[in-house]
Amino acid sequence: RNYAHLKTFLTEEYRRSDFSLPEINTAFLSKYEFYLRTHGCNHNTATKYMQGLHTIFINAIKDGLIVTDPFSSYDIKLEPVDRGYLTMSELQTIMNRKFSCERLTHVRDIFVFSCFTGLAYIDAKKLKKEEIQERFDGRPWIVTKRGKTGTDVKIPLLDVPLAILEKYKHTAESSKSSKPLLPVLSNQKMNAYLKEIGDLCGIEKNLTFHLARHTFATTITLTNGVPMETVSKMLGHTTLKTTQIYARVINEKTRNDMAALASKLGEIKM
């Protein structure tokens, strides 16, 4: 896709089908970034395309094809993205809802399981019996590797996810240790049914499976005083910087909540 954007840009801006690397300078980069931003790319998407182009220059320098890097004087940075999450009130609304349709109940249960464990979709889908292990505290933990990064993950199971595992322990899929423990549908179907669940529960946020992971990081752990380093390990983040995004979201909410409180108490005088 990056190549397609670049090819169209060259045609529209320069009436050419190609450019040699030595011809590309900071003026070219500035025009290309502006083109991306004015053709449907937000800041971070445009930045990722620019970073892809930068990789070409880095490799060309390593191979001795060019000696200068136009990106050395061109600043490109991703902007932090706020992660959506459910409040405890919203989560409890979903947990307490009774559904007449069994498939919605299954999807809700698996979503809630992820809210209380932080498991990503692929990790919840492949979770097996041998990955539930009793640890030093006498409680069962999830001991696995993140499918996305291969990072070791150890997550203590709270009462809610334990109850969900108990509920589905007699399903056909979980009857053998090599089979998944939970009846997880395709990601596309899960998200489609979650949207339906959100509508039925009056949740105005875009309910997707990944929102559960964000909810674990914010509402379940950080908001309740779990240290960021611990949360980072349970999420399987490779750097603490990734986890800090969630902390920033919580700090921003605290600031807004206190500003609202200050406004309400503004008339009280000493």
Regions found by a protein language model. Give the residues of each.
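N-terminal DNA-binding recognition helix of tyrosine site-specific recombinases/integrases
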Residues: H5-E12, F19, T38-S72, I122
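Short basic/aromatic active-site micro-motif
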Residues: I24, K48, H106-V107, V184-Q188, ...
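Short, polar N-cap/turn motifs at the start of nucleic acid-interacting alpha helices
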Residues: E131-G138, E204-K205, G225-I245, E252, ...
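C-terminal secondary-structure termini that scaffold catalytic or DNA-interacting sites
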Residues: T171-K176, L261-M270
